[in-house]
Structure formats: structure tokens, C-alpha cells
Amino acid sequence: HDFRGFSGQIAGGVVRRGQTVLALPAGIRTTVKAIHTYDGAVEEAFCPQSVTLVLAHDVDVSRGSMLVSPDQLPGGSTDLHAQICWMHPRALQPGRKVLLKHTTSTVQAIVTDIEHRLDIATLEPQPAPAGLALNDLGEIRLRTARPIFYDGYATNRLTGSFILIEPGTND
């Protein structure tokens, strides 16, 4: 029996049998031939269901890939701008190498800039010449080793969030 399905969780919207989807990062369009859930085949599924999708074409889909509607494309870039809460005792400074975990994918990244820290009492931007200290809120810029596809956090917190990991300790 020749079955090739791709399993994952729907992070937003609805997927329907017969719908055209775009596989990212491959950039290949295909059609959803079938949708399977724990209860069997269904015509449509929605967030946050776990599904197995059967696609009409062989496409390069692996851990961390996204299947999206061509009409509602996420952002995609190696240069990211983010608001973060720094939760490590060693200050976060420009040039620091980190691992960025986004959905189910982990990629190497480097902090290119600390734009500012936020004063917790006023939420006003403050200079951060020493970087971000433990529990600081701030805005940073990162460059990743490969493109990340994302939505704004206010739109979709599953695809609009990430965590930074210390490579040597996994902190």
C-alpha cells in the first residue's frame, strides 16, 4: 500500500480537501487530496486539530515546513525584529549566537542589534548599552541561518512566537 501523508497541527484557519496549498520553504504549490484525523477521513479540518494531509504532488515537506494558503502568505525572512523577555542570567548582547526555535524547527541565529529595553514601570524605551539583563523586556534584531516563515504574534501566537536557546547549555 503506497501512502504518503504529512502529519502536523493546524496552526490557523481551515484546510479543505481540494484546496490549493503552498509548501514553504520549498515554494511548491499542490492540492490537498485527503485529510485524515484520529477519527478517519474528513472533508475539512481547522485549528488546533492534528491531521495527516495527503498531497497531490511529491513535495519537500519536513519537520518545520509550513503548508499555507497562497492567498494568505506568512512573512518570511532571515532578518527578524522582535520584542522579547530575556530569561538568562548572562546578558543578551549584539553578536551573541543563539538557537531560535520556531514552531517545530530550530535554526542558528545571531543577535544583530539590541534596539532598546523597555522600562517595566512605564513601558518607555530605554537605552540598553550593556544589552538585556535577566527578565528585561526589549526589542532586538536577529539574523537566522535560513528563512523563518511567521505571522505577527497578534494574528497567530503559534506561528508568531519563538524561543531563544543557549547553544551550549540548552538554557
Predicted regions: what is each one?
Residues 2-171:
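C-terminal effector/interaction modules appended to NTPase cores
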